[in-house]
Amino acid sequence: MPKLKTRKAAAKRFKATGTGKFTRRRAFRNHLLDHKTPKQKRHLATKAVVHETDELRVVRMLPYA
């Protein structure tokens, strides 16, 4: 059986944790930050865990993660 290819775009966006879950960046932190509160921006700076309904998609894109 041939080796499975990793989706490079996904590999740059998701990181596997020790427990097998995946972390991701939060949206809404690239531009238009003037009107957002510092608390909001701090919250957006933290990593989020990929939701369980999307986890299978990420696993398929990253077969060796």
Swiss-Prot record:
<dbReference type="InterPro" id="IPR018265">
    <property type="entry name" value="Ribosomal_bL35_CS"/>
</dbReference>
<dbReference type="GO" id="GO:0022625">
    <property type="term" value="C:cytosolic large ribosomal subunit"/>
</dbReference>
<comment type="similarity">
    <text>Belongs to the bacterial ribosomal protein bL35 family.</text>
</comment>
<protein>
    <recommendedName>
        <fullName>Large ribosomal subunit protein bL35</fullName>
    </recommendedName>
</protein>
<dbReference type="GO" id="GO:0006412">
    <property type="term" value="P:translation"/>
</dbReference>
<dbReference type="GO" id="GO:0003735">
    <property type="term" value="F:structural constituent of ribosome"/>
</dbReference>
<keyword id="KW-0689">Ribosomal protein</keyword>
<dbReference type="InterPro" id="IPR001706">
    <property type="entry name" value="Ribosomal_bL35"/>
</dbReference>
<keyword id="KW-0687">Ribonucleoprotein</keyword>
<dbReference type="InterPro" id="IPR037229">
    <property type="entry name" value="Ribosomal_bL35_sf"/>
</dbReference>
<dbReference type="InterPro" id="IPR021137">
    <property type="entry name" value="Ribosomal_bL35-like"/>
</dbReference>
<dbReference type="Pfam" id="PF01632">
    <property type="entry name" value="Ribosomal_L35p"/>
</dbReference>
